[in-house]
């Protein structure tokens, strides 16, 4: 079945194309132990653009996409953030992106396999319609749909179900690791048992948190830390001027402090961060995609003893001196993933949020007429909004609210 859509391919000149593309329907399973199922057809309604899409385009330019293509094809229909209409079931749904032959997608092993709709071995949402495993079409919260149409404000909020789900998992993982890492210190300090020690360590790992970068992932993890640990000191670090609207939105939403990265040396930047934070960081989160993250954390000492360094960034190579790293008893972790329960929790949180305010729309015709130009000069340009989306099928959207 041929449909219109955008897809990535290995091509230096045309890594991203809009046009006719054949969609396929291989059997897929959600988790190991479940049956493989043919997908059911769903129509794309609204789709968001993610930094992963930009990275995939660059991979196509360099001829490095072959391992990402669905079996038997030489292209990947992209798009992993959005909402679809399922005609067979007469309902809207959010696509659970990751599935495959694994017991737990957040900790799949070498002998297990996985796929990600729109990212890895499975086609995504930037097409008129596509096939999805029926077990991976998650319901929307009550109140999103009226008279058969999806509220635009709700749709904008729920675009973030994938990245917010990632951050729900990240919070869980940092709580788990922080608790295991420092509970014996808390037991010694408070003369308490293991259960209380773990509870205290889980809380105090976020006492002084640095978020290096100010994209949506950084904002979401900051939001979750603030919701769960209201006494935490949170400092964002980014290049933008503090009075910029997107900076103010993040700072007001998370109730955080800010350091602009505009110093003539990394040492001065590190000193400014520690001063604003009131000490060294208990947790350092890297979300900027820059190699400066690990230098600030380790070489210039922003991450304190017994602290966590968690990188969400694509690209940077983390370097550290093993001797001082060992004596400071620090932990480095990195994982970009989530389970279904994390996405379901994200959907409920987002439905009550104000994140629709940071989503701007690009006209579908403007995007499809030259998708590469739209990527480079609007969606991912220096002055781009925090999130851009496109209404793919306007007949399902209620824009008059």
Task: Please describe what each predicted stretch is.
Residues 1, 35-38, 178, 268-272, ...:
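C-terminal hydrophobic helical "lid"/dimerization subdomain
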Residues 24, 28-48, 61-107, 123-124, ...:
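Glycine-rich beta-strand-centered segment in the early N-terminal region that forms part
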Residues 80, 99-208:
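NAD(P)H dinucleotide-binding glycine-rich loop of Rossmann-like/cofactor-binding domains
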Residues 163, 213-216:
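Glycine-rich Rossmann-fold phosphate-binding loop(s) that bind the pyrophosphate
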Residues 180-209, 226-229, 244-331, 397-399:
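Glycine-rich cofactor phosphate-binding loops and adjacent beta1-alpha1 units
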Residues 216-217, 242:
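Hydrophobic/small residue at the entry helix of a nucleotide-binding pocket
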Residues 238-243, 315, 338:
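Residues in the short beta-alpha loop(s) of Rossmann-like NAD(P)-binding domains
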Residues 307-310, 320-360:
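Rossmann-fold dehydrogenase core element
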């Amino acid at each position: 079945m041929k449909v219109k859509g955008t897809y990535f391919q290995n091509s230096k000149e045309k890594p991203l194309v809009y046009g006719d593309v054949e969609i396929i329907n291989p059997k897929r399973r959600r988790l190991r132990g479940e049956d493989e199922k043919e997908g059911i057809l769903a129509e794309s309604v609204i789709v968001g653009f993610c930094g992963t899409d930009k990275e995939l385009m660059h991979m196509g330019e360099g001829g490095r996409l072959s391992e990402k293509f669905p079996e038997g094809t030489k292209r990947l229909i992209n798009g992993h953030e959005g909402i679809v209409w399922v005609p067979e079931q007469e309902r809207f749904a959010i696509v659970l992106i990751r599935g495959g032959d694994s017991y737990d997608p957040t900790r799949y092993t070498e002998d297990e396999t996985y796929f990600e709709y729109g990212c890895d071995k499975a086609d995504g949402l930037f097409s008129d319609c596509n096939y999805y495993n029926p077990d991976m079409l998650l319901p929307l919260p009550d109140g999103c749909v009226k008279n058969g149409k999806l509220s635009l404000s709700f749709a904008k909020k729920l675009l973030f179900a994938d990245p917010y789900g990632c951050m729900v998992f990240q919070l869980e993982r940092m709580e788990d690791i922080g608790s295991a890492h420092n509970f014996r210190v808390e037991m010694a300090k408070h003369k308490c048992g293991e259960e209380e020690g773990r509870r205290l360590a889980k809380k105090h790992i976020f006492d002084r948190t640095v978020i290096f970068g100010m994209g949506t992932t950084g904002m979401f993890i900051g939001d979750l830390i603030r919701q769960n640990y209201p006494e935490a000191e949170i400092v964002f670090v980014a290049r933008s001027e503090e009075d910029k609207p997107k900076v103010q939105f993040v700072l007001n939403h998370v109730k955080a402090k800010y350091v602009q990265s505009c110093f003539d040396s990394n040492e001065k930047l590190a000193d400014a961060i520690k001063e604003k934070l009131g000490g060294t960081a208990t947790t350092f989160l890297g979300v900027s995609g820059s190699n400066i993250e690990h230098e600030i954390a380790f070489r210039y000492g922003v991450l304190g003893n017994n602290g966590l360094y968690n990188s969400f960034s694509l690209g940077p190579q983390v370097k550290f001196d093993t001797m001082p790293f060992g004596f400071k008893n620090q932990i480095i972790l990195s994982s970009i993933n989530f389970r279904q329960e994390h996405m379901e929790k994200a959907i409920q949180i987002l439905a009550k949020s104000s994140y629709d305010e940071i989503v701007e729309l690009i006209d579908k015709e403007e995007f499809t007429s030259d998708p590469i130009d739209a990527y480079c000069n609007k969606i991912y340009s220096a002055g781009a909004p925090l999130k851009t989306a496109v209404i793919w099928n306007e007949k399902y959207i209620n824009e008059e609210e």
